Structures are given as C-alpha cells and as structure tokens.
Swiss-Prot record:
The gene is lysS. It comes from Staphylococcus saprophyticus subsp. saprophyticus (strain ATCC 15305 / DSM 20229 / NCIMB 8711 / NCTC 7292 / S-41). Belongs to the class-II aminoacyl-tRNA synthetase family. Its EC number is 6.1.1.6. Transmembrane segments: none annotated. This is Lysine--tRNA ligase.
Length: 495
C-alpha cells in the first residue's frame, strides 16, 4: 500500500474519532428509505425546473447510498449518491440542513454511506437532484475507493475484491442482476411445465454422472471417503425410478480440473429429467426454455455476443455428429467400420489421437478439433458415439451411436442431453467398459455404481435428461468473455 493511501486512511481515522467525540455513531442505525435513484429519474425527469418547484410539497423523498462524487465549498455542495438502481445528485446547503449536519457533510468522504431527506428539483444545468433537508452519516468508510475516473483497472483485483468492482462498475452489477433473473426465469419456465424442483446430496460415495476428476474429502465420524459431486444426474434418475416423473435441480457441482476463461472448479448446473420423453423432446424443452429466458430477461431473442449476433428466435439447427464432421472435413464416419480405419483417417487429417482410442473416441476428436468452434448459431449435435456416452441409450438404428445431443452456441458447448439408458444389464456392461478404460489410464472414466444399477433393476421408465452449465449460459446472455465475469467470487490462486 502506498504512503498516499496510508495518509488517506489516517485522515479518515481522525475523522472517525472526531465523530465519536461529537457523540455521533459513525456506523449508524436503521434509515427509512422511501425512494431509489433510477425510479426517481423515471418519475421526475419529465418535469421542468419550474414544474418541480410547483410540485415541491409532493416530491418529498428519502434516499440512501454511497457517496461517489462530491464538490463545492463554502455554504453549499453537490454530490452523487449511488444505490443498487443507479445514481442521483444531491444538493446540500448549510441553511437547509443546519450547522451540525452541514459539518458532517463537510467531513464526509467518497465511499461514505449516507441518508438524505429532501425534495426534488433541477439545477440550472437541468440535472435532477434532491435538495437536502436532512443529511445523515450512516457508515464511515475507512478506506478510499479506487480512483473514480479509472475505476478498477486491475482485472485480477476486480475478481478478488468483487465488492469494489460492484461499487465502481455498474456494468458488473447489471451482469449479476441479470444472472439472478436468468435463474428466476428458468425456474418459472420449468415450474409452468410441471417440473418439480428437488435437492440431492453434494457429497457422494462414488463420483458418478460425468467424465471428470473429483474433489475428495473424508467424513471423520463415519471414517469414509466422500467425493464432491461432479454431476447431479444419478440421484435424479433414482427419483425418476421412484415416480417423480418430471424433476430438476439447480445446484453447485465440483470438478478438480483446470481453471480457464470457461472453467471454474465449482460451477452451477441445472439438470432435469422427464419420464416418457426422449432426446427429441428434450431438444424442444431446451430451445424453448433458453428462448423464454432471453425474451424475459433481455426483452429479445436476438443476442449480441462479441462481434456475433446470435439468433435464438429462429428454429435451431439439428445435425448428426457424423454429418457435421463430413460437412467440415469430407470424412464419412458412417462408412468407417473399424478402429484402424478411423485411425488412418485421423492421421490423414492431422487429428491428434492416442493409441487406446477407439472408433467413437476418434469421431469425437474429429468433431472437437475441426467442427466445434465453427458452430456459432444454436446447433443441436446428436448421435454421439457409445464410447463417450456411458449413460445414454443406444440408437436403435445404429448401435455405434447413442440418442444423445449437445447444444453448441458461439463454438461452445451449452448443454448435454440424452435419452437415458434404462437397461440395467446394458448399464452394467457400460460401467465395466469404463473400468477397463480406467485401467488403461483414463482417470476420468466412470466408476462402477452398484446402487444405481440396483435402482435401475426396479424399472426406470423411458426418460429424457438434460444438463446445462448456468455460468456459460449467463456468459452468453450478458456478453461476458470470461466465466469469472459471471461468478461473484471466482476461484483465484492464493497471493
């Protein structure tokens, strides 16, 4: 911390003591606020200076917030007070608030939290303002805010000290307000469709439901190893077995993997499951739900992301993974019949693979390396290979593939869904194949889950399921480049 900063803090501490000496509590009490900044602008900006003067008696308001600017000397001054909705100017005169309150005004610093009672008026320049009749210090700020003209220039500091980012960056505040509304509209849509919101455990005895490395913890009283959940899936499917036919959960998921602009070790997902549905039905739900959210939160289904305009309004494209690869590379995986032929095709097209990869893995590598980033407009890619889809139902017409889809927008995966595998015998065989992969070095392969197989043996109806990463969806709908911009407190390396 610089000497200048230390000096500013010392001055604020001195002012704090002066307030105590005057018998004033610098950390205040309840304040009855009647109005907020933006609604005041909406209600009163329409009136002229003269009209406001005539309406003075009916324009009495009480506001509270943080001092963001302050100017003026002598017997009067102006400031901008910021609350959650925005900013409004206040005008403080000694002959209006009295000598004692004006002394408090004079000693107030940027960042202090204040309460103001007064009436609405417009200045000579036409700016709507509150003419203070009472000025109250509610909280003394002991640290100065970042430079008001530059805000928080250090991106890392914005993430580490999100509270400062929210104070100084209204765009950031609006992003998190939109995030809250996105979740609200997601719930509204699903509840209207007859889904039941449930809560399931975050600590599991087996890390299942996804191909990911888990965080491991230990339960001392039970002397048991537990895993922070890497997916919500398997518990929700147990509920489908139990007769809860349309369920969803919005919750935190943990994966012990890399940190990037698109990945955080803990993130929020929605998973939903509907009995008697298949992956085509889930495509419809996904498309309609995201379109609904965009229209309700943004007022439009045409979304700007970076330099792209994303059309969520028109019917979304649907394409088989093998067809998508053929369109982009000319390689027809429908006609490739063996692992060796797939490896030859990979070598010819410069696709990076490993020796233990089979047909399905190689098709997926073709897709990820050549196709994925080209899918800018909303696209459902379906027909994933069985090797990479241990929980999805085999396709009835071609058992090399599954009834699964992923949603891609702006070259990123935004959802994963399938017609769920409800055959316990097939499910056991898939888990056993995953165990072989684990022995061959795939540390993200699925564990055997005997309890889940037992649940399937009681009978799970044909079911469609979906998982969506909330953080990526919020990134899309708020035009945010990094996942850290949509997480209030993203994970950061220790200093």
């Amino acid at each position: 911390m610089s000497e200048e900063m230390n000096d500013q803090m010392q001055v604020r501490r001195q002012k704090l003591q002066e307030l105590y000496d005057l018998g004033i509590d610098p950390f205040g009490q309840k304040f009855d606020r009647t109005s907020m900044a933006t609604p005041l602008h909406e209600d009163w900006d329409q009136f002229s200076k003269e009209e406001l003067h005539e309406k003075e008696e009916e324009s009495h308001v009480s506001i509270a917030g943080r001092l963001m600017t302050k100017r003026g000397k002598g017997k009067a001054g102006f400031a901008h007070v910021q609350d959650l909705s925005g900013q409004i100017q206040i005008y403080v005169r000694k002959d209006q608030v009295g000598e004692d309150q004006f002394a408090i005004w004079n000693s107030a610093d940027l960042g202090d939290i204040v309460g103001v009672e007064g009436v609405m008026f417009k200045t000579n320049t036409g700016e709507l303002s509150v003419k203070a009749q009472s000025f109250t210090l509610l909280t003394k700020a002991l640290r100065p805010l970042p430079d008001k003209f530059h805000g928080l220039q250090d991106i890392e500091q914005r993430y580490r000290q999100r509270y400062l980012d929210l104070i100084t960056n209204q765009d950031s505040t609006q992003t998190f307000i939109k995030r809250s509304k996105i979740l609200q509209e997601m719930r509204n849509y699903l509840n209207q469709q007859g889904f039941l919101e449930v809560e399931t455990p975050m600590m599991h005895q087996i890390a299942g439901g996804a191909a990911a490395r888990p965080f491991v913890t230990h339960h001392n009283a039970l002397d048991a190893t537990l895993y922070m959940r890497i997916a919500i899936e398997l518990h929700l499917k147990r509920l489908i077995v139990g007769g809860l036919e349309k369920v969803y959960e919005i919750g935190r998921v943990f994966r012990n993997e890399g940190v990037s602009t698109r990945h955080n070790p803990e993130f929020t997902m929605i998973e939903l499951y509907e009995a008697y549905a298949d992956y085509h039905d889930i495509m419809d739900i996904t498309e309609n739900m995201i379109r609904h959210i965009s229209e309700k939160v943004l007022g439009t289904a045409k979304v700007t992301y970076g330099e792209e305009t994303i059309d969520l309004e028109s019917k979304w494209k649907r394409i088989h993974m093998a067809d998508a690869v053929k369109e982009e590379t000319g390689v027809d995986f429908f006609n490739i019949q063996s692992d060796e032929d797939a490896k030859i095709a990979a070598k010819e097209h410069g696709i990076e693979i490993t020796d233990n990869m089979k047909y399905g893995h190689i098709l997926n590598e073709f897709f990820e390396q050549k196709v994925e980033e080209t899918l800018i407009q909303p696209t459902f890619v379906y027909g994933h290979p069985i090797e990479i889809s241990p929980l999805a139902k085999k396709n009835a017409e071609d058992p090399r593939f599954t009834d699964r889809f992923e949603l891609f927008i702006v070259g990123r995966e935004h959802g994963n869904a399938f017609t769920e595998l409800n055959d316990p015998i097939d499910q056991r065989a898939r888990f056993e194949a995953q165990l072989v992969e684990k022995e061959q070095g795939n540390d993200e392969a699925h564990e055997m889950d005997e309890d889940f197989i037992e649940a399937l043996e009681y009978g799970m109806p044909p079911t469609g399921g979906l998982g969506i990463g909330i953080d990526r969806l919020v990134m899309l709908l708020t035009d945010s480049a990094s996942i850290r911009d949509v997480l209030l407190f993203p994970y950061m390396r220790q200093k």
